Each structure stands twice: as C-alpha cells, then as structure tokens.
C-alpha cells in the first residue's frame, strides 16, 4: 500500500524504519491480502481501514477519525472498534478523537463524548452515563399503521409496559 509509505514519509518516519512501520499498520488493520492493490480497488470497508492506518501511522499524539466504521458490516465494525480501542490504550500515548452518528460506537470507544446540534453547537459533554442521566428522559416511539384497532393497539402497548397516549 503505497499510501502508507507516502504518509510515513510525510510524518517523518526515518527511511530505515518505514517498511517496518508500514507493515505494522497493515497487520494491525488486517490488510495483508491487499498490500499490493491500488487504494481505488479496495472495498469500502478496506478503504476505511486504510484511512485509519493513515491516521495512526507514526503513532501521533492525537488521532482524528471521521466515522471510522460507517458502512461496515457488524463483524468488520467490531474489528475496527477493537483496533481503535487498542490504539487508544497503547501506552496512553495517543488521544483518539472521533466523529460518529452511532451512539453505540461512541459508547464502545469513548470515555468522554460531546453531542453537537446543527453541526456545531455542543449541547452536552461528559461520560456516556452522565449524558444519559442528565438528558435522557425516555424514548418516543412513532409507528405509522394503515388500519387501526385502538383496543388492540392499547393491549399491545400495555403488554410492552409502555406509558403514554396513542
């Protein structure tokens, strides 16, 4: 993957260590079978892996990841999460900042999170549990049905233990 050699050079990795550093990234992200392929021919998931490899090469103190597992199947997503978790735990030398639309991903990978509204206004900041305790007042479920029998719907609602009006 020429991309990784290029970014290793940009990040100042000495020439005598580049191959070793690139191989380490390739192995971390399970890209061994794709090392000789052009980036444009990789699947979407492998392109995500390559993007993360570019971000982590050279062990920078701050790693920025934009939706690192978006569009991945569940198995690939879990793999990516384990990679990100290992990076953030590695000698506590790198801080990982990521953006995501997935609360599940944020909870799996973050010790602190901020929630933005309209692309820029932070509404809350803290641990997942702090945010839930402070801002979560429940859930709203909206169901659209073609034909309604209000008695059956109320019975179903009661079976689920839900409160509120239909």
Locate the predicted segments by residue.
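Conserved ABC ATPase signature
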Residues: 38-42
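Conserved ABC ATPase "signature" region
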Residues: 5, 9-34, 86
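Hydrophobic anchor residue at the start of the ABC signature
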Residues: 52, 80
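Helix N-cap at the start of a conserved alpha-helix in ABC-type nucleotide-binding domains
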Residues: 74-76
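Catalytic Walker B motif of ABC-type/P-loop ATPase nucleotide-binding domains
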Residues: 63-66
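Conserved catalytic motifs of ABC-family nucleotide-binding domains
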Residues: 59
């Amino acid at each position: 993957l020429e991309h990784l050699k290029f970014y290793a050079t940009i990040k100042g990795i000495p020439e005598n260590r580049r191959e070793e550093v690139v191989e380490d990234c390739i192995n971390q992200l399970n890209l061994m079978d794709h090392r000789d392929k052009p980036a444009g021919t990789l699947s979407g998931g492998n392109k995500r892996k390559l993007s993360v490899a570019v971000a982590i090469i050279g062990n920078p103190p701050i790693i920025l990841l934009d939706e690192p597992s978006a569009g991945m199947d569940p198995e690939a997503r879990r793999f990516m999460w384990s990679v990100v978790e290992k990076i953030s735990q590695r000698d506590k030398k790198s801080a990982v900042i990521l953006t995501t639309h997935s609360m599940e991903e944020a909870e799996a990978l973050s010790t602190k999170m901020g929630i933005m509204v309209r692309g820029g206004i932070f509404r809350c900041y803290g641990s997942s549990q702090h945010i839930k305790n402070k801002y979560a007042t429940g859930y709203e479920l909206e169901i659209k049905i073609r034909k309604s029998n209000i008695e059956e719907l109320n019975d179903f609602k009661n079976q689920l233990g839900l409160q509120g009006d239909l």
